[in-house]
């Protein structure tokens, strides 16, 4: 199940990267008050016709091993649960249990 979620998230990331420039241009032109309103409406329509999954708001950071969507460390791309187990076993280089 986690494999399917990660594949779906990867596809969303690829689509978001593909349409990033076009989406930013349309948004900037839509907000430009110097342009005529009919032109801005056309650009707003084009923006709405872009694929829904091409928005970065739909991209979710997921754990690469379990697919868990919550509490994912962005640096390692793993969840806190997997991070704790890997850190205690030792495969994460440079990570050790703190003591003071």
From Swiss-Prot:
Coarse class of the protein's main subcellular location: mitochondrion
Homology family: Belongs to the universal ribosomal protein uS14 family.
Tree of life domain: Eukaryota
GO process annotations (BP): translation
PROSITE patterns for the chain: RIBOSOMAL_S14 (PS00527)
Record InterPro entries: Ribosomal_uS14, Ribosomal_uS14_CS
Keywords: Mitochondrion, Ribonucleoprotein, Ribosomal protein
Subcellular location per the Swiss-Prot or TrEMBL entry: Mitochondrion
Protein name: Small ribosomal subunit protein uS14m
GO MF, one example: structural constituent of ribosome
A GO cellular component annotation in the UniProt record: small ribosomal subunit
Name of the gene encoding the protein in the UniProt record: RPS14
